[in-house]
């Protein structure tokens, strides 16, 4: 059950409608999903979040499918059911195969396990793994 109301387009302020319109136009969808409807309770958060998502998810050095798969991985790591479902659906729509999804989940699981072990053991970082800015 949601902890905030979902703001429908008909009930939205002009400021929220403008963001909703941009989301619908950018994503070529008839309606915005529940995430955006929930954020509409705080128009400034809605606008800021949409602008950041729109910028980060636009085509760039990483292709759109790779970006969605990264979003799935982070969502699994953060245990966000909504984000797991929405970004998995988006990744499949962008061409992710079931085999890629299975491999992605196996990778997330392994990374979580090895990260926990390395953190718990406070393993010192090998010199060849140290990354410096600009290198």
Segments (PLM) and residue ranges:
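Hydrophobic alpha-helical segments
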Residues: 1-135
